[in-house]
A protein has these predicted regions:
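Short hydrophobic/aromatic-enriched beta-strand-loop microsegments
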Residues: 124-130, 162-169
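TOPRIM metal-binding catalytic domain and adjacent DNA-binding surface shared by DnaG-type primases
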Residues: 1-58, 173-176
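Phosphate-handling DNA/RNA-contact segment within nucleic-acid enzymes
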Residues: 45-141
Length: 176
């Protein structure tokens, strides 16, 4: 996995896990593609990152190849974390894909990984501690469709982190 963190033992979801997701309306392909959902046991460490722990809680794991990271979701609590802290959003590789915006489609931003899975991973779930990076990561998206519950968070964070200091240069005027 990531060089900065210890390897995390991953397993396939149990049949009970799969049945639970199916009852919640999640399509089997959404659990398997583009990369299969896996299961890890661990906890959130003091630095806010996932730490493998055999006596910890069960977390569903999603590999984020473009960030060389892995997102962990604890379904019972709804908590999200990652292995190295490099990932911006669950499913973030879709942000820069042309097909995301073709035929007047929009980038979907979901409030919860279950909604994301029910939509067959057609969008992203922004990591809770990564919303301040939203402006830099999403400003070039032509269209965004966002969960209503996220609208205040989106509006608060879709501003540049800082603006340059501005100086006004007086124009020279000539006599007529």
């Amino acid at each position: 996995m990531m060089a900065s963190r210890p390897d995390c033992p991953l397993a396939c979801p149990s049949q009970a896990d799969l049945d639970s997701f199916r009852r919640a309306g999640v399509d089997v392909l959404a659990m398997a593609t583009p990369a299969a959902m896996q299961v890890a046991t661990g906890r959130i460490a003091h630095d806010g990152l996932f730490e493998p722990d055999g006596s910890g809680q069960r977390w569903f794991a999603f590999r984020e190849e473009d960030a060389d990271d892995m997102v962990f979701w604890q379904r019972q609590t709804g908590r999200l974390t990652s292995c190295s802290g490099r990932v911006f959003a669950l499913g973030q590789e879709i942000i820069n894909e042309t097909a995301t915006y073709s035929f007047d489609c929009a980038l979907n931003i979901f409030a919860d990984p279950m909604d994301w899975l029910n939509a067959r991973r057609d969008g992203i779930v922004v990591m809770p501690n990564r919303w301040p990076a939203a402006f830099d990561r999403l400003r070039d998206c032509p269209r965004i469709a966002i969960a209503e519950s996220l609208l205040p968070t989106y509006r608060r964070n879709m501003t540049p982190g800082r603006m340059p200091e501005l100086y006004i240069t007086p124009e020279r005027r000539t006599a007529a």
